[in-house]
Swiss-Prot record:
InterPro entries documented for this protein: Ribosomal_bS18, Ribosomal_bS18_CS, Ribosomal_bS18_sf
Family the entry assigns: Belongs to the bacterial ribosomal protein bS18 family.
Molecular function GO terms recorded: small ribosomal subunit rRNA binding; structural constituent of ribosome
Keyword Isomerase: no
Name of the molecule in the record: Small ribosomal subunit protein bS18
GO cellular component, one term: cytosolic small ribosomal subunit
Quaternary structure annotation from Swiss-Prot or TrEMBL: Part of the 30S ribosomal subunit. Forms a tight heterodimer with protein bS6.
Length: 95
């Protein structure tokens, strides 16, 4: 029994040595528009839409904004409608 116990201890040490290295793990943030009290995506809310548009007037990708695919499509459509109705500019001017 001592031999099997020693073998398990050495195996645990080997595993422990591998896990002793600190592994960087970035926690993935959830969709900011899917939380319970999130604002409704609507073309009549330019304050919300402007947060998802870059300084040049382009839509920010979901990998930067952490918005899920379903909400990203809704945002794209809302921004397009808001631009047509002149609630948002097509191109932001440099200051």
């Amino acid at each position: 029994m001592l031999k099997s116990n020693n073998a398990s201890e050495t195996a645990a040490r080997k595993v422990g040595d591998k896990t002793a290295k600190k592994v960087f793990f970035r926690r993935r943030k959830g969709c900011p528009l899917s939380v319970p009290h999130a604002p409704v995506i609507d073309y009549k809310n330019p304050e919300l839409l402007i947060k998802f548009v870059s300084e040049g007037g382009r839509m920010l990708p979901s990998r930067i904004t952490n918005v899920c695919a379903k909400k990203q499509r809704k945002l794209n459509n809302a921004v397009k409608i808001a631009r047509i109705l002149a609630l948002l500019p097509f191109v932001f001017q440099a200051k």
